[in-house]
Amino acid sequence: MDANLWLWVGQILLALAFLSVAYGHALGFEAWSVRPGFGWMTAVGRNNMRVIGGLELLGSVGLILPAVTGVLLWLTPVAATCLAVLMALSVIFHARRHGEGASIVLNLILGLIAILVAYGRFVVAPL
């Protein structure tokens, strides 16, 4: 398979992953913060979680919409880069808290995929 196809797979996986949590982070603070494994949300705070959820939503849209519409194609690798930075910051946050290893692993995986998509769309197979 060619690089373009693999990059699309990465873009779609990232978009789905971030879309699946963006709503809960942005608007479902009360419901999500009491779930097991999501206690960290109270440490971040409601307003900060809204910002994070909004960034996740924008990143998800930025991974797919420019390529589908053919407009502002440079936004796709920029969105992937921004999501990679968000995941790096998330890893740092969770590393400072005890017992959140699963969050660290997930954020590392998503961050790695985002880095690969960013590099791929900037260098290997630009849109």
Name each model feature, range by range.
Residues 1-127:
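Membrane-interface extramembranous regions
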